[in-house]
Amino acid sequence: MMDTDKDDLPSATDHSEHESGDAVKVEGGASKTASNSKDPSRPRRKKARRACFACQRAHLTCGDERPCQRCIKRGLQDACHDGVRKKAKYLHDAPDGALVPGAQGNFYNQANGLPKISPTEYTQNGTNNAQQQQQKSGTIYASSTPSYNNNNGTFDTNNATNTVLPDSAALNPGPFTATPASPTFSISTSSAMPSLTQPTNDMTSGAGQGSFGAFFDPSDPALFNFDLASMNFGNRYGALEFGMLGHMATGAGDTPPSDNGNQRGGSVGQRSNSQQFGNPPGAFTTESPSQQSFMFGDPVLNDWSGGQNTNPRMNVGSGLYGQGGGGGGGMHLLQQDAPHAYAIGSNTFASPSSTTSPHATTIAPSQFDDSPMKTKTVISTPHLRQQSLYNSNSNKRRHREPSAIYDSVKEPYSYTGGFHKLIAFIKRRFSPPKTVRIAKALASIRPSFIATTKTLNQDDLIFMEKCFQRTLWEYEDFINACGTPTIVCRRTGEVAAVGKEFSILTGWKKEVLLGKEPNLNVNTGGGNNTSSQSDSTSSSIRGGAGGRMRNQEPGPNNMAPVFLAELLDDDSVIEFYEDFARLAFGDSRGSVMNTCKLLKYKTKEDMDSVNADDSRWNSAMTHHIVGKGGIVGEAGMNRLGFKDGRVECSYCWTVKRDVFDIPMLIVMNFLPHI
């Protein structure tokens, strides 16, 4: 029969106690009936957060104190420590000490009975007088928290959550620097440890403070200003992981990265004379106080964490964790705005050619200057670089605003007239077998066009044109920023927008393609031996393509946008319309990749000059077109296909639909074959 105290009430699983009503012996020798466990007047014992190892094995009710009362009665107070619970699969790699639900669950009485330690009692080898007294007394306090290795041995981090950093230690921790994403770290004790100037917490354990390990334990939520109690997590490890993700994401979108070294602070670490990219992101070391902290070796992290921020609150600079003597003024400036715990801030990751001092730097007043005259930064992150390009071009681009589109469009576009002009052009240019193939392709999608447009009224058609113009307004930026020859056409094949590279490649001027200048092209892809045929059919071609007769005087009634069929040779036109019939009402995000031959813009005078200079072309022109490295400049790009009037290309195109799910425009990109 186990000895029990008066207040030691049995639990439901205590098999060593008798049932209610049985007599048990107490210390005085008298017998007393045990309390009924179902008696409502029976005092309730507060449930412990975690039972000790002995009580857990015996299935007894334990308490929060260490050693617990049961272990004291049984003489097991020296070996009383928290029991190990079975962990979930996703927590198998988590340290046991990180799974405590509360902030001080198993750190209650680690320092109980130990004398208070003054800051001057720390020695250089990482031990203190309290540890020596503890070893002499023979008392052993076990812990389930992990131990970290250093050059002198091991140390644990039991009291990491009890540690309270003073202001001076938080802002100037010496050579120690921690990365929040690393669960382990190593410490080199080649240099003497700096003595503390202020006491920490009265409950601080000597074992935890012996090597300053608790100051920079990544599992300590105090280093990140985490309130684990408000996160509603069942375990401390999950709450810490969730808080760390939120901490890393805070302010990431508000800090544009920069490659300019003088606009980065050094809150994580600064460049050292002897160590620039030597350490991996998951580890950090210790150097002498005159040297700087480690530096991340990951360039992606450098771009993410660095940069100039327009918000002074986030622009803590290098004074937050600087280690030199030159940061006095900057330190006083930043104590109000700096975060009260370790945070990922802007860094001074200078290039090898930079003139930035390797020692600690202070924040210059120019870093808080939002003047537009300051040095332009070079952005390496693709997403932010695109935003910077957009902002830099916004001041000098576009003389019109998007609102002008909705005010200027008053009538719908006549797609019916455009299709009639296209059919007339096809009949006059192509042979009957080729015309039949194109007509079959267009006839296959004609019912779909009728079904989608028959319910649209005048307002819908006007809105459709506004959508087209607004989308085209956005594609203008895409065309200007893309170095690939690009054109945008309506669903009828009429050119609506064109890039400069396409004009250089084909010789078609933008004004001619958009119908702002007369079209004098006579090249239909027949070659030099069919120049007479081209001359005989040029007038009919111009008439069939919308009333543009080559022998007529230029005028506003004789100019219209060029059809896509006028830019391709016969086989390419047939293949395009057969592919368009499959994609127009098919996959809304589909695209087509194929090869084609673009027709160069040639007037009658150009065709005559090519025939006369054929011998000179073979000897001289080839040298200007292609060199050892490919095309030489814009002139060489323009000379491609100048002899036969055709440029072999690979092209990719897609169909953009409007709100009525009707094909609205065709976007095409070309790459010439060199």
UniProtKB/Swiss-Prot annotation:
| Residue span of region Disordered | 1-46, 117-181, 250-321, 344-374, 519-557
Mark out the compositionally biased spans (Polar residues): 120-148, 269-278, 285-294
Q: How is this protein annotated for GO cellular component?
A: nucleus
Compositional bias of type Basic and acidic residues: which residue ranges?
A: 14-25
Q: Pfam families in the record, alphabetically?
A: PAS_13 (PF24990)
Q: Which PANTHER family match?
A: TRANSCRIPTION ACTIVATOR OF GLUCONEOGENESIS ERT1, ZN(II)2CYS6 TRANSCRIPTION FACTOR (EUROFUNG)-RELATED
Q: What is this protein called?
A: Transcription activator of gluconeogenesis PMAA_028970
Organism of this sequence: Talaromyces marneffei (strain ATCC 18224 / CBS 334.59 / QM 7333) (Penicillium marneffei)
